[in-house]
Amino acid sequence: MSTYTRPVMLLLSGLLLLTLAIAVLNTLVPLWLAQEHMSTWQVGVVSSSYFTGNLVGTLLTGYVIKRIGFNRSYYLASFIFAAGCAGLGLMIGFWSWLAWRFVAGIGCAMIWVVVESALMCSGTSRNRGRLLAAYMMVYYVGTFLGQLLVSKVSTELMSVLPWVTGLTLAGILPLLFTHVLNQQAENHDSTSITSMLKLRQARLGVNGCIISGIVLGSLYGLMPLYLNHKGVSNASIGFWMAVLVSAGILGQWPIGRLADKFGRLLVLRVQVFVVILGSIAMLSQAAMAPALFILGAAGFTLYPVAMAWACEKVEHHQLVAMNQALLLSYTVGSLLGPSFTAMLMQNFSDNLLFIMIASVSFIYLLMLLRNAGHTPKPVAHV
């Protein structure tokens, strides 16, 4: 059976449109708040409201999928996010935007859980690595194109909201032409997220998602600050961030393919080791382009491989709950990692960014090496 079936391709097509809208709003909302002369702490609180919505959406989506299936859950998530977009134009103010960004955060997380769970349920242990690699490629390409749109079109609030909301609703259209089967057996009891987090044989995958959140959250949030403190111009910062993200895009498919062929344990070990090497290269003031490229190629591909590892350890009817647990783990890592790293950078040195990334990666590498004898190795498929 083909890996990229018609439902998968249509699902990813819709996701691309949604990711464009998400990327544009995530970039412009802080700028719009600043234009309204809101203080830094207010901008931060609105941002936190969005991520709080992410957590709530992640926890709710499993129940929604079980009740109404993948297609209707996807439609509902898209409508919720569209409401969060349109609501920003109803009233401009701190409390209003706090509420609407919370709504948008719920919708955004629901979209992620629905798409990731649908891909997991559509695939097998032979091709889940490639499916998740395709998902991450679409996500990063959409994010990149969203940034490009921001630089090319008017960024006025009432100019952006109509087409961003329209883009979100257009993301529903591809799913109208297919039906993504929810193959969770109805005679199975609901699986709790907590039980998935405690599942011993999937712990390396869960830990990998936490580490991935720490690494990517720190790179996304603090790399521009690191470069700025090094005297790099804003234009050049954009270039170096593009190098980082492009490496992540280019690395998705080959690493997903290798994980499917040679087993996820081996690939995870190599990835984490390369992240450590990339961090050391940045600390040693080596050529920035190759250092950032290998850091991006390895760091940005940790999440899908760790997710595929965890999902092959559970029964088919547990996949949605496991995916919720993994996304929750990633979100927690992406929230805590940058906060802790930023405090270290402020109090000691900017180099703590890469020391932190290398340190958590080294801890995860030790887990991968130590648990090899206790955790069954994923079966390699030619």
UniProtKB/Swiss-Prot annotation:
Q: Which Pfam families match?
A: MFS_1
Q: Name one GO cellular component term.
A: plasma membrane
Q: Please provide, alphabetically and separated by semicolons, the GO molecular function terms listed in this UniProt record.
A: transmembrane transporter activity
Protein origin, superkingdom: Bacteria
Membrane topology of the entry: Multi-pass membrane protein
Gene3D superfamilies (UniProt xref): MFS general substrate transporter like domains
Q: Which residues lie on this side of the membrane: Periplasmic?
A: 35-44, 100-101, 152-156, 225-234, 346-347
Q: Which residues lie on this side of the membrane: Cytoplasmic?
A: 1-13, 66-78, 123-130, 178-203, 256-269, 312-324, 369-382
List the protein's name: Uncharacterized MFS-type transporter YcaD
Q: Which gene encodes it?
A: ycaD
